Amino acid sequence: MEGLAGYVYKAASEGKVLTLAALLLNRSESDIRYLLGYVSQQGGQRSTPLIIAARNGHAKVVRLLLEHYRVQTQQTGTVRFDGYVIDGATALWCAAGAGHFEVVKLLVSHGANVNHTTVTNSTPLRAACFDGRLDIVKYLVENNANISIANKYDNTCLMIAAYKGHTDVVRYLLEQRADPNAKAHCGATALHFAAEAGHIDIVKELIKWRAAIVVNGHGMTPLKVAAESCKADVVELLLSHADCDRRSRIEALELLGASFANDRENYDIIKTYHYLYLAMLERFQDGDNILEKEVLPPIHAYGNRTECRNPQELESIRQDRDALHMEGLIVRERILGADNIDVSHPIIYRGAVYADNMEFEQCIKLWLHALHLRQKGNRNTHKDLLRFAQVFSQMIHLNETVKAPDIECVLRCSVLEIEQSMNRVKNISDADVHNAMDNYECNLYTFLYLVCISTKTQCSEEDQCKINKQIYNLIHLDPRTREGFTLLHLAVNSNTPVDDFHTNDVCSFPNALVTKLLLDCGAEVNAVDNEGNSALHIIVQYNRPISDFLTLHSIIISLVEAGAHTDMTNKQNKTPLDKSTTGVSEILLKTQMKMSLKCLAARAVRANDINYQDQIPRTLEEFVGFH
């Protein structure tokens, strides 16, 4: 029956109404109920024949299912739309989101709930607003769709239409008394979303309907949002309409100019100077009431520059692009505040431009500043940390000097991020745990790349001590992957992933130097993963024993000298010797096997099945247990 259900689903998906009817012909009522309620899974989607037919716009199939087989319109599934995964979507939601008007009308006329919500509280009306289908929006509203239902982030239909740039839908919703001043969780209104996206006609429409100029949760007005996003026409429109004070007006112009200086998509150094100069003139417009800047203290990442405080100072850097780039970053940090989520992006972009031009020192200064800002704001920094591993690897590959204090600084930030991501994994909901775990493991790999890079860098004794302290700090936290791997397991494992953007030019695993360094910093040599394997169990399975003999030899020596038990058994009761996959690793292991009397006694206890639980000290119980 399951195979037949697959054919039924395929026919519905492809709009083959006659095939579908033939497949269902002469079936019992219970069989039909099973076949038409069967949830098929494909590419991360879960849907019934009705849902997939509606999603793909097959009106004839939908009509057959509704009128002849009385399929329930409230069936729900999981579908993908524009890269988003939608859980709890009905056929009506899918048809509305995909723009299939005929199917929408069929479903509504057969009693589909126009206000049914998905898991994230999205309605069919919201789906139609996202797609900009005014005809579907009107039809749903005329059939009692509630325009005020917001999703789980309190984001309304008006907001999504404003952000996506659907002017006609926005106008219609406003005419239907949608609230232009409703706020999303982040504190943003429809005007914020329209301003950020640069939809000037929608901004005009919202102003006409008396949309209020308010700050969002990050202290940003629609005017500031437009300026930060380089939407000059929206900024000028809001300045001409909005009743804003002199300081707000000046800061909007400054922010606009500053944003043009370091924006990948909208870079325009001429506009940078133009708007910064306009703002400066406004500061000095009234000689009796000059509005002085409250400049930031000099910041090392910005070359310890001080922001221009008068027209003459600004004129002096007009032809100096580098100075204008730094001026832009300083202005943004002053106006937005160091804790603003958007401050770091242009800093990272400018650093990347320096890296592309082989100006690595400038790049690292900026990226370290951005990293500190993001960690201070409790942002996820796994991409930032990986970026450092990539640029350090590139530098080593090009024989450029990587400074040990820079590595130590990034390692310190990495330890902090891993500690925070360990807590996130513990406290996060089941729905988000997979992503959180991915980020956490990515941080562990990045830490190992940085340790590997440190072994290829000239370090003073003092610098090496500082680096070792960070390694010790992380080892002390005992971070584990899903498989229960410690840092030591990862260091000796050929399956440890290595990022392929510059990093794999410098880093590889198993890695003898990283293994030795981890052991020197206190890594537990006999720690086991979820399968009871120690690092020694892992390395003896290395499949390049000839071409990479030195690595294999060095790691086995390091592990044994650090106290690895060569007779330790895993959950399959296998010792490292049993797990050895090559003659070379077997020989290396045998030459290193120095069985202590303590180990021989423990093996004898296990081999003869002697009861030792609660008969010997607890520390010895564990020792006997892994033999």
Swiss-Prot record:
Summarizing the annotation, the consequence of altering D356A is:
Does not affect cleavage by a caspase-3-like protease
| Reported effect, F130A | Abolished binding to -Gly-Leu-Asp-Arg C-degron at the C-terminus
Query: Has the keyword Lyase been applied to this entry?
Result: no
Gene name linked to the record: FEM1B
Any one cellular-component term (Gene Ontology): Cul2-RING ubiquitin ligase complex
Amino acids binding Zn(2+): C186
Q: Which residues bind Zn(2+) 1?
A: H185
- Sites annotated Cleavage: D342, V343
The ANK repeats lie at 45-74, 87-116, 120-149, 153-182, 186-215, 218-248, 483-527, 531-568
- Tissue/organ expression: Widely expressed. Highly expressed in testis. Weakly expressed in other tissues.
Q: What is its main location?
A: cytoplasm
Family listed = Belongs to the fem-1 family.
Q: In which pathway does it act?
A: Protein modification; protein ubiquitination
Q: How does this polypeptide assemble, per the annotation? A: Component of a CRL2 E3 ubiquitin-protein ligase complex, also named ECS (Elongin BC-CUL2/5-SOCS-box protein) complex, composed of CUL2, Elongin BC (ELOB and ELOC), RBX1 and substrate-specific adapter FEM1B. Homooligomer. Interacts with PPM1F and PHTF1. Interacts with the death domain of FAS/TNFRSF6 and TNFRSF1A. Interacts with CHEK1. Interacts with NKX3-1.
Regulation of activity is described as: Activity of the CRL2(FEM1B) complex toward FNIP1 is inhibited by BEX family proteins (BEX1, BEX2, BEX3, BEX4 and/or BEX5) in absence of reductive stress. Mechanistically, BEX proteins act as pseudosubstrate inhibitors that associate with FEM1B via zinc in absence of reductive stress, thereby preventing association between FEM1B and FNIP1.
Q: Where are the TPR repeats?
A: 344-377
The protein, known as: Protein fem-1 homolog B
**Residues annotated for Zn(2+) 2 binding in this entry:** C186, H218
Q: Where in the cell is it found?
A: Cytoplasm; Nucleus
Q: What does this protein do?
A: Substrate-recognition component of a Cul2-RING (CRL2) E3 ubiquitin-protein ligase complex of the DesCEND (destruction via C-end degrons) pathway, which recognizes a C-degron located at the extreme C terminus of target proteins, leading to their ubiquitination and degradation. The C-degron recognized by the DesCEND pathway is usually a motif of less than ten residues and can be present in full-length proteins, truncated proteins or proteolytically cleaved forms.
Q: Which GO terms describe its molecular function?
A: death receptor binding; metal ion binding; ubiquitin-like ligase-substrate adaptor activity
GO BP field: apoptotic process; branching involved in prostate gland morphogenesis; epithelial cell maturation involved in prostate gland development; proteasome-mediated ubiquitin-dependent protein catabolic process; protein ubiquitination; regulation of DNA damage checkpoint; regulation of extrinsic apoptotic signaling pathway via death domain receptors; regulation of ubiquitin-protein transferase activity
Q: What UniProt keywords are attached to this protein's entry?
A: ANK repeat, Apoptosis, Cytoplasm, Metal-binding, Nucleus, Repeat, TPR repeat, Ubl conjugation pathway, Zinc
